[in-house]
């Protein structure tokens, strides 16, 4: 199952959370919000999607609306956000 991880290194988690709640992930797949236990301003938004949903999620992330949101996020971050696509390997 493909996984996308969006890594945020924030200046202020509470300010970012307001923006996140206003523009949540798509309703495609299963999404989790993880916060660093050692750095409370590091956040990972993790989405698990079916292979058939990857294109829709990539289209959502690449949409003009989300690019505008990401510009706002980067302005409240200590580093640019990072989008990482992963695929599961059998052990």
Which residue stretches match the model-derived regions?
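Short S/T/G/P-rich N-terminal loop/turn motif that feeds into the first structured element of a domain
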Residues: 1-91
